[in-house]
């Protein structure tokens, strides 16, 4: 409700350099999309509940159902049609509904009365506050990036969005999926105060991620142009747009592995019930990013914004492991680096070979 009342002020900050027509369209879409927030929030809660119940695949099924709704909407409406925004809301509502049905099947019971005297509420509030701050800070970071990008030519924000989503989908597919599976083991080892066992699982997790992500990242950088041409090079997406997006995509890829490392480190912090460390990491990441946005965008324009994002993520990933070392004295940072070197070197050799073949 507050967003709807103050939407012009908020959108003015978010998209300062937009034209009048673009602002009008953004305003129309935002008023509709905002109603998906309750469904997204509820979806996240029930997703966590089902993961605890060892029903991790249900959230993937719910996502597929929401994608089906969006695809049907795309077939029935024009891409610029405002009905597409309502379809997005409908997709989130349907995915939440699917999770809710499975949650009831797993024994979930709804109590309409909230008792503030329950002991776990205080513990939950203490733990969730740093997570809440981290989320707010991350959103501020996103707004800052869009604010600076809105000052450049039309289509830059779109290219940055496409490049970001395509590159960091690697992180979503690889590290997020792995951490979802491993998180219960992390929390079990942390609850038993078995730091040696927790660190052993951490090293294995890093090993799996590095052997998977490094080849994809370096290979993606080498053949960035053909990838963007294949995925986005159709319709109104011109050759110049493909080149711009390919350059953005290549730079964003450099931040994928640091993002994976940061994601894993944040989950270890949560397992150790030190969510404050994740909050400090988020603050460091955003601080570095905004500083570099200001410094690099003046000389390198939009590419400077992309470099700023990658460097900030790297700073955050380094910070989270340094902080983890302060609470887990058995953690070997040397072992963490060791798990990264071999797959990086071999992936780099692979990338050089692919580049030579491509240039022949």
Regions found by a protein language model. Name each.
Residues 61-72, 79-105, 284-289, 302-323:
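Hydrophobic alpha-helical transmembrane segments
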Residues 19-45, 237-265, 280:
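Alpha-helical transmembrane segments of multi-pass membrane proteins
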Residues 100-138, 196, 326-341:
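Interhelical loop/hinge segments that connect adjacent transmembrane helices in multipass membrane
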Residues 338-360:
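Transmembrane alpha-helical segments of multi-pass transport proteins
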Residues 1, 176-194, 202, 265-266:
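Helix-loop junctions and terminal segments of transmembrane helices
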Residues 1-13, 203-235, 243-260, 290-291:
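Alpha-helical transmembrane segments of multi-pass membrane transport and lipid-handling proteins
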Residues 35, 46-75, 254, 261-294, ...:
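Alpha-helical transmembrane segments of multi-pass membrane transporters/permeases
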């Amino acid at each position: 409700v507050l967003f709807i009342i103050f939407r012009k002020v908020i959108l003015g900050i978010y998209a300062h350099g937009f034209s009048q027509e673009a602002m009008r369209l953004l305003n129309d879409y935002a008023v509709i999309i905002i109603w998906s927030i309750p469904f997204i929030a509820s979806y996240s809660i029930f997703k966590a509940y089902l993961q605890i119940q060892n029903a991790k695949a249900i959230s993937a099924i719910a996502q597929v159902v929401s994608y089906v709704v969006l695809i049907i909407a795309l077939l029935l409406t024009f891409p610029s049609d405002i009905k597409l925004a309502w379809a997005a809301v409908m997709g989130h509502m349907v995915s939440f509904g699917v999770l809710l049905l499975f949650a009831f099947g797993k024994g979930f019971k709804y109590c309409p009365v909230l008792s503030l005297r329950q002991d776990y509420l205080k513990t939950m509030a203490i733990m969730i506050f740093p997570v809440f701050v981290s989320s707010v800070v991350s959103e501020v970071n996103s707004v800052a990036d869009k604010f600076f990008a809105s000052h450049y030519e039309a289509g830059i924000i779109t290219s940055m969005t496409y490049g970001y989503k395509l590159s960091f989908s690697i992180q979503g597919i690889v590290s997020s999926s792995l951490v979802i599976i491993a998180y219960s083991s992390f929390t079990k080892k942390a609850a038993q105060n078995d730091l040696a066992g927790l660190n052993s699982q951490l090293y294995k997790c890093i090993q799996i991620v590095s052997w998977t992500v490094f080849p994809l990242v370096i290979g993606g950088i080498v053949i960035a142009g053909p990838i963007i041409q294949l995925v986005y090079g159709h319709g109104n997406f011109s050759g110049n747009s493909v080149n711009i997006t390919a350059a953005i995509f290549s730079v964003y890829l450099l931040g994928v592995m640091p993002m994976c490392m940061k994601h894993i480190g944040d989950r270890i912090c949560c397992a150790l019930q030190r969510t404050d460390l994740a909050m400090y990491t988020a603050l460091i990441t955003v601080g570095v990013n905004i500083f570099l946005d200001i410094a690099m965008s003046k000389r390198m324009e939009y590419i400077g914004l992309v470099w700023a994002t990658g460097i900030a993520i790297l700073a955050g990933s380094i910070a989270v492991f340094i902080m983890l070392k302060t609470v887990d004295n058995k953690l070997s940072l040397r072992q963490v680096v060791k798990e990264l070197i071999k797959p990086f070197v071999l992936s780099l050799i692979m990338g050089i070979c692919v580049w030579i073949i491509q240039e022949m």
